Amino acid sequence: MDKKAARLRRATRARKKMQELGATRLVVHRTPRHIYAQVIAANGSEVLASASTVEKAISEAIKYTGNADAATAVGKAIAERAIAKGVQNVSFDRSGFKYHGRIAALAAAARDAGLQF
């Protein structure tokens, strides 16, 4: 099993648990260059809010899009957008990535901005 397959297996296991609980998810995906976040409804078919370093407003405010500072900016933006839609309680779906570095920075920024998980 390669690295990506193992990560996807971890992600699937966590997502099934969140689906059983019927929780709104804060889903994070990262690449070496960018980081993406989406708040997905409990039914799994509707994206309530999204933010990423690809967006012009966020990428202009930061120097580089692939570091923890960029993840912090995305975490703050996703929290503000989710709260504007009336979502405060979410489950954090790290998509099988380690809770470390950019993933942890995004989570901390989202918590500081008002999301609860």
UniProtKB/Swiss-Prot annotation:
This is one of the proteins that bind and probably mediate the attachment of the 5S RNA into the large ribosomal subunit, where it forms part of the central protuberance. Belongs to the universal ribosomal protein uL18 family. It comes from Aeromonas hydrophila subsp. hydrophila (strain ATCC 7966 / DSM 30187 / BCRC 13018 / CCUG 14551 / JCM 1027 / KCTC 2358 / NCIMB 9240 / NCTC 8049). GO terms for biological process: translation. This is Large ribosomal subunit protein uL18. HAMAP family: Ribosomal_uL18_B. Keywords: Ribonucleoprotein, Ribosomal protein, RNA-binding, rRNA-binding. GO terms for cellular component: cytosolic large ribosomal subunit. GO terms for molecular function: 5S rRNA binding; structural constituent of ribosome. Part of the 50S ribosomal subunit; part of the 5S rRNA/L5/L18/L25 subcomplex. Contacts the 5S and 23S rRNAs. NCBIfam families: L18_bact. SUPFAM superfamilies: Translational machinery components. It comes from the Bacteria. The keyword Membrane does not apply. Pfam families: Ribosomal_L18p.
